[in-house]
Amino acid sequence: ILSNCEGAVELLETLTKKKDPTFLTWLPLSHSYEHTVQFIQIIVGAKVFYAESLEKLISNMGVAKPTIMTAVPRFYQNLFTKINMNFEKQKGLKKKLINQTLELGKKILKKEQLSFSEKILNFLCEKLVRKKIRSQFGGNLQAFVSGGGALDQNIGEFLNAVGLPTLQGYGLTEASPVVSCNLPNLIKVESVGPPFRTNKVKIAKDGEILIKGENVMLGYWNLEEETKNVIKDGWLYTGDIGELDQNNYLKITDRKKDILITPGGDNISPLKIENELVNSEMIDQAIVYGDNKPYLVA
């Protein structure tokens, strides 16, 4: 756990050196993600607020004025829906300005060069749109950190574009739990960022992500056989499929056990389809079924 905290503190240094850090916590304190975050809060000397409830989370942000907040993808999905619904109600010049904010924000996120006129327009977007959105969340937010599941790429792009920096990370309880996280100065929403310096990551021949480091568990309590299945030669076999890009950013593509195989031999990722379905405001949860079946259903 301390090794995990060390890696996280290095990430947070750029976010906490300008202001005294303030966290707003709402995940269960027994959750492995939140459990480790609590130690990190102590290490960086943060002021910690505990949310009253999920329903009051947004209003609590106005009081706490957090600089950093950790949450699971479900929260960001709800946030995306609420902001987007408000955007849809706008008309005329406001609507055009919102569209420009999204377009220019996504270009900046992808490190694309803005023209002189785009820079002027982006300055207006910053003052008239992004600043107002940030003020609704306390006005001091340096970053949202997403973990505990896959964050939809469209949602990540949207939140970053409207002025809410959102860093997606990756981890699992067996690794204490954080393995990697996006960096504030180079956010790749399609990835979960570079591995922490305190652990090693490599990709097996079949694409499985393997982890080694002091953050990896010793084993499952009184489950020797299960431990042998996941820890081999000091490497933790995560069961996740992924790849490392040229910047050493890790991208999760699937769960090894979740791949659906059709009678025709096609390998299909249900996660991608499920994520597309739940983007609809009419769908709360989705599951795709059809392993070894002639067609898929959801």
Functional labels for PLM-detected ranges:
Residues W26-H31, G148-A150:
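Conserved AMP-binding
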Residues L12, K19, Q153, N160-M217:
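Extended hydrophobic/aromatic segments used for targeting, binding, or gating
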Residues M69, L159, V201, D240, ...:
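Residue-level signal for inorganic ion chemistry
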Residues T67-T70, K82-I187, D284:
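Gly/Ser/Thr-rich phosphate-binding loop
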Residues L2-T22, L29-R130:
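Conserved AMP-binding/adenylation subdomain of ANL enzymes
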Residues P195-T262:
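Conserved ATP-binding/catalytic segment of the ANL
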Residues D291-A298:
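Conserved loop-to-beta-strand segment in the C-terminal subdomain of adenylate-forming
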